[in-house]
């Protein structure tokens, strides 16, 4: 049945709900406070609502959200009065606060902002809160962001600029960044707020002239570097440095690493580089395996990048390549301490450690699992999840996920593992992983790395001649085992196969393309496609993983002319999504291999060497 039709907003329903004994957003008596990770579990017991009430709230939610965005204050107030303490209410309140801030309704804004849990307050609402109080604490950090900000944060930065509360160098660097990202209107507004508009002979006008080399089309020109060289005498050190950083970034992302380094090396003020530019400066040196140069680049990165396990690991590798094993070990220790990510695992292996997938906690107590399942906030998420499954409603499923994250965000580690068990038993697999993944000391790898549908997956992996651990590593990243998962571009199911690809596969292996929408058919198609990608890409798992995400042609284009270490290939993939995807899939596969007692449990060996382009 159509939930929107059945549960449409009506004044009578709202009035009845207000008079009912539901929990209001101001009722904090039933909330479970955050607990120390060392405390024993105290299972929350928030008031439960009936299924019809949960679905009623969901039916009204989208209308209330639309009302919040258009500033229909009465409708929003009516919804919040009866919606209870939920992710739905929190989302609506955030949207309403954005609208109130945009309209300058500061008295109502301040009143409603107090009702919002700080953990759920979105960045734009925080910006409006500072505008409402005349504070500019966030502006100093926001001005260092060189791409588009939410409207409220843009207003905060411009207000701080007008009040003379920003570092001038940072502010003009943001103007350049906006210009390079085609955000000309925001760049113009900030320049005006700084008192130097783009018109006339002001600094703003000189910044605007940089579009001739840093604009999205201009930087692609073969003459961009010569144009910048001819302009340099009229540019400040900061302007010139930023512009060379833009050109270096473009060349590095197009795998022209020698040229990229030559441009980056003309940057005289490296404080002008954005994080993205700095990382690609390092990737250019990494791809060419210029270890001395790489270590120097990493050591000049801002603190936040130097603390990233990516660059801790590669700094360690660069020290090792230069023969400094003691300093290399120090960096590996730092990277290995960052968790269970790609570089933590690789760093651990450099220190002689292999991943350990032995649980250090017992399974959750069955009584605790039952009590957790009865918690009102958990139950709300489960109601939405089960109804989304039966109706194949992707939007409702996303809201169920939001409610689960809302319900568990203050949980200690014991409760997270109990919640993960509840989710697993209800086949809410993605949220089982979400909860289990958030523990740091109490570890249950069977919940972190779930393996549902195992008989089917292993059977089709074996038929395709590929490693089941690799298949599970890919499914965990693609869909988190959500049966009806559908991407924004139309990829379907557990293995996120595109319908057009499914038709092609079906014709080759004697299936109906409609089997894409079944568990069995989706896994069969996905494993066949993985094997085909591997065969087409020189039998290399790393390239096949990249090809599964971005297409085999791109994976082939990213090869070097000579063999390249798999981790270097992965780190220098130009697409952020694919770069992260490959690292996560291969890390997942290594953990699954350990859980499945396979012999291949080294991530470095699994990454191997990517052959040269032929």
Place the predicted regions along the sequence by residue:
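Alpha-helical solenoid repeat scaffolds
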Residues: 13, 21-463, 469, 489, ...
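Catalytic glycan-binding domains that act on GlcNAc-containing polysaccharides
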Residues: 227-234, 262-264, 269, 322, ...
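Gram-negative bacterial Sec-dependent N-terminal signal peptides
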Residues: 2-25, 585
């Amino acid at each position: 049945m159509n939930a929107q039709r059945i549960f449409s907003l009506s004044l009578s329903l709202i009035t009845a709900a207000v008079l009912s004994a539901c929990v209001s957003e101001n009722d904090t008596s039933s909330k479970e406070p955050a607990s120390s990770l060392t405390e024993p579990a105290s299972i929350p017991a928030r008031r439960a609502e009936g299924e019809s009430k949960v679905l009623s709230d969901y039916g009204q939610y989208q209308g209330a959200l639309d009302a919040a965005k258009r500033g229909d204050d009465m409708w929003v107030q009516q919804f919040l009065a009866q919606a209870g303490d939920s992710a739905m209410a929190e989302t609506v309140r955030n949207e309403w606060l954005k609208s109130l801030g945009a309209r300058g309704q500061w008295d109502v804004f301040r009143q409603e902002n107090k009702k919002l849990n700080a953990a759920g307050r979105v960045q734009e609402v925080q910006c409006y809160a500072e505008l409402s109080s005349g504070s500019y604490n966030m502006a100093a950090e926001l001005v260092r962001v060189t791409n588009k900000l939410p409207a409220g944060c843009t207003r905060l930065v411009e207000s701080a600029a007008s009040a003379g509360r920003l570092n001038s160098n940072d502010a003009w660097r943001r103007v350049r960044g906006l210009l390079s990202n085609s955000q000309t209107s925001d760049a113009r507004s900030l320049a005006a707020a700084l008192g130097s508009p783009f018109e006339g002979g002001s600094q703003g006008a000189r910044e605007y002239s940089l579009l001739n080399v840093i604009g999205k089309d201009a930087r692609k020109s073969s003459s961009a570097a010569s144009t910048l060289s001819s302009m340099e005498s009229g540019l400040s050190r900061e302007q010139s440095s930023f512009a060379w950083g833009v050109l270096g970034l473009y060349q590095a992302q197009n795998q022209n690493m020698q040229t990229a380094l030559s441009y980056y090396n003309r940057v005289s003020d490296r404080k002008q580089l954005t994080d993205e530019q700095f990382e690609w400066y390092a990737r250019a040196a990494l791809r060419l395996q210029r270890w001395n140069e790489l270590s120097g680049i990493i050591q000049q990165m801002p603190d936040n990048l130097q603390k990233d396990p990516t660059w801790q690991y590669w700094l360690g590798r660069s020290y090792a390549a230069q023969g400094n094993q003691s300093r290399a070990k120090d960096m590996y220790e730092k990277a290995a301490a960052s968790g269970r990510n790609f570089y933590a695992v690789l760093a651990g292996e450099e220190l002689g450690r292999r991943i350990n997938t032995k649980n250090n906690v017992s399974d959750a107590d069955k009584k605790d699992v039952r009590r957790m399942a009865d918690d009102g906030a958990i139950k709300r998420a489960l109601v939405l999840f089960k109804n989304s499954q039966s109706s194949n409603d992707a939007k409702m499923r996303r809201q169920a996920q939001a409610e689960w994250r809302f319900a568990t965000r203050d949980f200690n580690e014991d409760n997270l593992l109990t919640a993960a068990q509840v989710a697993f038993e209800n086949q809410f697999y993605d949220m089982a992983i979400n909860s289990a993944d958030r523990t740091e000391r109490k570890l249950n790898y069977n919940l972190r790395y779930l393996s549902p549908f195992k008989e089917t997956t292993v059977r089709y992996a074996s038929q395709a001649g590929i490693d089941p651990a690799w298949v599970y590593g890919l499914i965990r990243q693609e869909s988190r085992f959500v049966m009806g998962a559908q991407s924004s571009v139309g990829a379907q199911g557990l293995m996120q196969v595109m319908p057009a690809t499914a038709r092609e596969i079906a014709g080759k292996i004697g299936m109906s393309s409609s089997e894409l929408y079944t568990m069995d058919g989706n896994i069969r198609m996905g494993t066949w496609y993985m094997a085909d990608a591997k065969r087409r890409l020189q039998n290399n798992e790393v390239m096949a993983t990249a090809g599964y995400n971005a297409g085999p042609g791109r994976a082939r284009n990213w090869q070097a002319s000579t063999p390249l270490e798999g981790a270097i290939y992965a780190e220098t993939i130009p697409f952020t999504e694919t770069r992260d995807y490959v690292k996560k899939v291969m890390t997942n596969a290594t953990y699954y291999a350990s859980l499945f007692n396979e012999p291949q449990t080294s991530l470095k060996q699994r990454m191997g060497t990517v052959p040269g382009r032929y």
